[in-house]
């Protein structure tokens, strides 16, 4: 029933439901000092007013970089044995039966310069990166096989999130705020809203970060709000088995460069990490684990989904119109980077209720390498592949 309501409501509101450039709650007292370099100024132009949450807690991040191959074993309990034949639906790695029906948590994560380093996002099974105002990006991170104790910084939702969230029936969605139209539309989607307005005790503001990039989720606690009758989620795509080669049409590549506007992103194949190491604005994109150690982001799969963006009629605080990705349904070009190679193919989303499908040039579904996958909703013409000879 909720899906039927969502389909009708989505058509009327999705184009109008632009991002709100301010979180709707008054700013809490914060003694942190905001950097005044030009990059930080760009971030400030689109930052929202923070929620009134501050329990005085801060977290210490180590400057030690731990560069090591990512673990391939993910489960909710270390005491459970993985059952042969069961695979995590979004990661393709072995999983227990109990973990297969565990809650899924979607969190909206900040990626402004003031948000770095983020915490916990490296554990996500799946991350969507989308363009927001000011030429910056934000992440929609999907956690299932492993949910860190803390994740942050959490920011507000965007209209682009609705067609991404709709296929994740029964998932939890944590976020900091958005405009009234987004909130109303979110109520029609078959996800459980566990945003800061509904579950304020499961969030806190760090005092060692500038607002509004200082809202952290007690992500493991958010799982308590999941429904009891969860069903195993359907896999989003097939996964390669051990020893199975990438399709013959795949070509070796060093990686990909993406220009978002104010944010430049690169992925480079890193054999020692077993994935595509991410760089942002010319530097390694490092994130913190829950012990405060910095680690490199290196997902096993990177998908460049070339996407049309339209500018809404809503303006940010600098008078800039706010972009919305046109991904409710449709098709287009996609590059799938996996195991040091690229498959130039197509993406197809038949309707708003299903996940986007990725196929090679022959129309066959692309098999991902087991591990994490990042899907970048890149504006057309804003990405370039890097040949091995370059």
Where are these regions (language model features)?
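Extracellular mucin-like PTS domains
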Residues: 31-74
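Bacterial signal peptide processing site
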Residues: 18-21
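A surface/extracellular/periplasmic glyco- and lipid-processing/surface-interacting theme
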Residues: 65, 74-126, 133-390
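Short, intrinsically disordered low-complexity segments
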Residues: 1-2, 40, 56-58, 217, ...
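Sec-dependent signal peptide recognition
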Residues: 2-8
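C-terminal motif of bacterial Sec signal peptides marking the signal peptidase cleavage site
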Residues: 14-16
């Amino acid at each position: 029933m909720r899906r039927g309501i969502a389909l009708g409501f989505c058509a009327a509101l999705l184009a109008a439901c632009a991002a709100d450039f301010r979180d709707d709650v008054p700013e809490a007292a914060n003694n942190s000092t905001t950097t005044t370099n030009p990059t930080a100024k760009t971030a400030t132009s689109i930052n929202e007013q923070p929620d009134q949450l501050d329990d005085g807690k801060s977290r210490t991040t180590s400057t030690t970089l731990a560069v090591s191959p990512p673990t391939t074993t993910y489960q909710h309990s270390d005491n459970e044995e993985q059952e042969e034949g069961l695979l995590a639906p979004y990661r393709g790695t072995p999983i227990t039966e109990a973990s297969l029906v565990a809650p899924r948590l979607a969190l909206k994560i900040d990626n402004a310069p003031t948000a770095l380093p983020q915490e916990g996002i490296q554990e996500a099974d799946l991350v969507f990166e989308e363009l927001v105002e000011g030429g910056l990006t934000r992440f929609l991170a999907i956690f299932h096989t492993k949910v860190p104790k803390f994740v942050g910084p959490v920011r507000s939702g965007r209209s682009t999130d609705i067609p991404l969230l709709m296929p994740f029936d029964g998932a939890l969605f944590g976020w900091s705020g958005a405009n009234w139209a987004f909130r109303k539309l979110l109520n029609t989607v078959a996800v459980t809203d566990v945003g800061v307005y509904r579950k304020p005790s499961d969030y806190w503001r760090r005092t060692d970060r500038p607002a509004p990039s200082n809202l952290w989720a007690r992500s493991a606690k958010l799982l308590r709000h999941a429904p009891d009758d969860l069903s195993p989620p359907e896999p989003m795509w097939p996964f390669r088995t051990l020893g199975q080669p990438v399709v013959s049409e795949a070509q070796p590549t060093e990686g990909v460069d993406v220009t978002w506007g104010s944010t430049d992103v690169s992925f480079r194949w890193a054999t020692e990490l077993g994935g595509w190491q991410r760089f942002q604005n010319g530097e390694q994109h490092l994130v913190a684990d829950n012990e405060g150690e910095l680690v490199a982001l290196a997902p096993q799969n990177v998908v460049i989904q070339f996407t049309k963006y339209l500018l809404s009629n809503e303006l940010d605080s600098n008078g800039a119109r706010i972009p919305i990705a046109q991904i409710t349904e449709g098709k287009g070009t996609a590059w799938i980077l996996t195991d040091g190679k690229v498959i130039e193919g197509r993406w197809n989303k038949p309707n708003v209720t299903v996940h986007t499908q990725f196929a090679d040039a022959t129309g066959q579904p692309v098999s991902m390498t087991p591990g994490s996958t990042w899907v970048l909703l890149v504006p057309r013409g804003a990405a370039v592949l890097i040949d091995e000879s370059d």
